[in-house]
Amino acid sequence: PVRRVLDVPRAVPEIVVALVLIFLLGGGPVPAMIAIALHTVGALGKLFSEVNENASLKPVEGLESVGAGWGQRMWFGVIPQVAPNYLSYALLRFEINIRASAILGFVGAGGIGYDLRNTMSWGQGKFDEAAAIFLLLFLTIVAVDQISSKFRHRLTDGQASAKVML
């Protein structure tokens, strides 16, 4: 039932939610943040539920056979299996949200996309500002992608400590 509820915010694109919220709340960053947050909750809910379904129950059963409580079974049997995927998906959504925020800003939701739209007024000669904004956006996305990629590799190679994974 929860999974079906999370399908609703995931099914509606951020841009549609943002445009409705801009109409209701006015322009600015708040409608964009709400739109991105709703879509992210839906997407991560689906991804996390699939990770949970694919987790092996054998460690949990083994821990139960030696008298471990529910918390111990989850902490030692489930979390080590799902934490790397949770973190990987969260980092992926962070990258997606950066891109989405630029697009939503372009349609009037504030932020760097809004600045980009304002500088792209043809005929005012602000091409250097527009190019600088494009470059900053590109470099930000590449930097976040590289950092999250390295972090994901650390997790999947087993080099990350338990403190980092949690």
Residue locations for each model-derived region?
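Alpha-helical membrane-interface segments at transmembrane helix boundaries
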Residues: 2-9, 95, 117-120, 124
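Hydrophobic alpha-helical segments of membrane proteins
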Residues: 12, 16-20, 82, 86-94, ...
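Membrane-cytosol interface at the C-terminal ends of specific transmembrane alpha-helices
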Residues: 27-78, 84-93, 146-149
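Generic hydrophobic transmembrane alpha-helix motif, especially the helices
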Residues: 2-37
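Glycine-rich helix-loop "coupling/hinge" segments at transmembrane-helix boundaries
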Residues: 23, 100-136, 156-163
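C-terminal transmembrane helix and the adjacent membrane-cytosol boundary/short C-terminal tail
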Residues: 88, 131-166
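Generic transmembrane alpha-helix signature in multi-pass membrane proteins
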Residues: 16-21, 50, 61, 91, ...
